[in-house]
Swiss-Prot record:
It is found in: Cytoplasm. The lineage of its organism: Bacteria, Pseudomonadati, Pseudomonadota, Gammaproteobacteria, Pseudomonadales. It comes from Pseudomonas fluorescens (strain Pf0-1). Its main location: cytoplasm. This is tRNA uridine 5-carboxymethylaminomethyl modification enzyme MnmG. Keywords: Cytoplasm, FAD, Flavoprotein, NAD, tRNA processing. Belongs to the MnmG family. NAD(+) binds at residues 275-289. InterPro entries: FAD/NAD-bd_sf, GIDA_C_N, MnmG, MnmG-rel, MnmG-rel_CS, MnmG_C, MnmG_C_subdom, MnmG_C_subdom_sf. One of its GO terms (cellular component) is cytosol. It comes from the Bacteria.
């Protein structure tokens, strides 16, 4: 039997975006080919050994709710789990896990290799086959031709990748891997806007040379959280601690004295790409925050079978001799041995405003982009885009309509809408602050928001669907039980509740009413009554929905009011220069972005509410005119 050459979907790249894209496409029944330059690096964590965090865990849980692999791999490879913002409201709580690089990568590869409809092949893609503004396939580095009408590009930092250490630079996709030069040249021939971005990574440290006794220990949470809705803590390997230390005045002096040897700050200006605002290099921190006497450094283990450590907070592209001085100036690392030097990497990205909501390019039919090629940073952002692009590539291959969640439905929707509407001039990172409807888009209810849609699309398997339906039913039953259970003052149970919570009952209440009070919690009610949900996820949902019901209802009302105009489609052939009343500037902005809906148009910087009103009037006139033409 020959190796097949025709597929429905081809995915280029085996990182976090590529693996989720390939899995999503294959889960939906599309014959899918995943091309990777090295099978051994499928699912590799190129930078920090962690998944989740503020805003990011929301994306991971949404990927999971849609059947993706990231959360499951994290549960299988996670060596420390914590809930961030645990004392704050549920909208901003976020799960974060340190991961063993080897275990995480192995989990991703096992999921890939056991996925039906998915072929994995080790070859770099050097060229795209494009005919009449439609992608038809790819050509690999050894001239093999694979054909598909949907191709997903998830190239990470490999497009024209250039690694910098001090004033020296060399080509690379990441340390130890070659860049994609031929494919970068091919993409620059397409009518797409292209730019350069930069990211960086710190030197890795040998843990045997570190004195942990002078650092602050940071253990994981107890009880241990899980990342996947299908996960359990028994899946976790051995749990370990992280450690915290700080830079100091000596560290800052070393950096300041050597800025002229930095590729970012030297007179030569070796790096032209813009780096991530929210994950700056240590030289950036010293330059931008000169008044700060120290910066935190989180010492994170790379895995259970290695002594290698990741010093989170000192990403740098300074020369190796300076890196060594920096590391050894930090408390606890005076005798530290560097295993791998830190570096910065520049790479090509393409303006995401040239994409549709489906992540398909506007100019080449069937060509989808996901991950860092769209200007984002982070495993979670990449995985979310990959899943969406892979799903839409499969939908297109089957002749079905594309799908993207709205801003009020998912952080994935916020991410995509921000990218294709606003574009980005620097690596884009997700935060909860980017979402208008944070209380509805919590990490804990991602499955309740998305799993039903995932099942409809073919992304969710039978086991996940059965577990979801059971959970949803259990929530409804528990709410009904609380609503129908009444407590009277003066009874044994009423007195027990009053004593437990310091809240005398003035009249008869049902348990749901009592739970809505800020001083009463679900666990306390269970303790007093002896009854409650066994599943902690069910208990959590019941408590959050009850306590925040008023706020949630207000957000839902606001969403309903805005939805009509939000979803109003703008014609593909609309000519903004013919709409009277629009300024030249706004005509230009609308023409450049080509928004798909009124809602997207309203979020373009500089497009005023008055301009949106003019667009609505134009659409009504256009609709009335077409009705007259049809009646004639």
């Amino acid at each position: 039997m020959d190796f097949p050459s025709r597929f429905e979907v081809i995915v280029i790249g085996g990182g976090h975006a590529g693996t989720e894209a390939a899995l999503a496409s294959a889960r939906m029944g599309a014959k899918t080919l995943l091309l990777t330059h090295n099978v051994e690096t499928l699912g590799a964590m190129s930078c920090n050994p962690a998944i989740g965090g503020i805003g990011k865990s929301h994306l991971v849980k949404e990927i999971d709710a849609l059947g993706g692999a990231m959360a499951m791999a994290t549960d299988l490879g996670g060596i420390q789990f914590r809930v961030l913002n645990s004392r704050k409201g549920p909208a901003v709580r976020a799960t974060r896990a340190q991961a063993d690089r080897i275990l995480y990568k192995a989990a991703v590869r096992e999921i890939l290799e056991n996925q039906p409809n998915l072929w994995i092949f080790q070859q770099a893609a050097d060229d795209l086959i494009v005919e009449q503004e439609q992608v038809r396939g790819v050509v690999t580095q050894m001239g093999l031709r694979f054909f598909a009408d949907s191709v997903v590009l998830t190239t990470g930092t490999f497009l024209g990748g250039l690694i910098h250490i001090g004033l020296q630079n060399f080509s690379g996709g990441r340390a130890g891997d070659p860049p994609s030069i031929a494919l970068a040249h091919r993409l620059r021939e397409l009518p797409l806007r292209v730019g350069r971005l930069k990211t960086g990574t710190p030197p890795r440290i040998d843990g045997k040379s570190v004195d942990f006794s002078v650092m602050t220990e940071q253990p994981g949470d107890t009880p241990i959280p899980v990342m996947s809705f299908m996960g359990n803590k028994e899946q976790h390997p051995r749990q370990v601690s992280c450690w915290i230390t700080h830079t100091n005045a000596r560290t800052h002096e070393i950096i300041a004295a050597n800025l002229d040897r930095s590729p970012m700050y030297s007179a030569a200006g070796e790096i032209e790409g813009i780096g991530p605002r929210y994950c700056p290099s240590i030289e950036d921190k010293i330059h931008r925050f000169a008044d700060k006497e120290s910066h935190q450094v989180f010492i994170e283990p790379e895995g259970l079978t290695t002594h290698e450590l990741y010093p989170n907070g000192i990403s740098t592209s300074l020369p190796f001799d300076v890196q060594l001085q920096i590391v050894q100036s930090i408390r606890g690392m005076e005798n530290a041995h560097i295993v791998r030097p830190g570096y910065a990497i520049e790479y090509d990205y393409f303006d995401p405003r040239d994409l549709k909501y489906s992540l398909e390019t506007k100019v080449i039919g069937g060509l989808f982009f996901a991950g860092q090629i769209n200007g984002t940073t982070g495993y979670e952002e990449a995985g979310a885009q990959g899943l969406l692009a892979g799903a839409n590539a499969a939908l297109r291959a089957k002749g079905k309509e594309a799908w993207c969640p709205r801003r009020d439905e998912a952080y994935i929707g916020v991410l995509v809408d921000d990218l294709i509407t606003l574009g980005t001039q620097e690596p884009y990172r997700m935060f909860t602050s980017r979402a208008e409807y944070r209380l509805i888009l919590r990490e804990d209810n991602a499955d309740l928001r998305l799993t039903e849609k995932g099942r409809e699309l073919g992304l969710v398997d039978d086991a996940r669907w059965a577990a979801f339906c059971k959970k949803r039913e259990s929530i409804e039953l528990e709410e009904q039980r609380l609503k129908s259970t009444w407590v009277r003052p003066g009874t044994q149970q009423g007195d027990a509740i009053a004593e437990k919570f310091g809240t005398p009952l003035t009249h008869e209440y049902n348990l749901l009413n009592l739970l809505s009070r800020p001083e009463i919690d679900y666990a306390g009610l269970v303790e007093v009554t002896g009854l409650g949900a066994e599943d902690p996820q069910v208990a959590e949902q019941v408590e959050i929905k009850t306590k925040y019901a008023g706020y949630i209802d207000r957000q839902q009302d606001e969403i309903a009011r805005l939805r009509a105009s939000e979803d109003t489609k703008l014609p593909v052939d609309i000519d903004y220069t013919n709409i009277s009343g629009l300024s030249k500037e706004i005509q230009s902005k609308l023409g450049a972005t080509r928004p798909e809906t009124l809602g997207q148009a309203s979020r373009i910087p500089g497009v005023t509410p008055a301009a949106i009103s003019l667009l609505m009037i134009h659409l009504k006139k256009r609709g009335a005119g077409r009705q007259l033409e049809q009646s004639a």
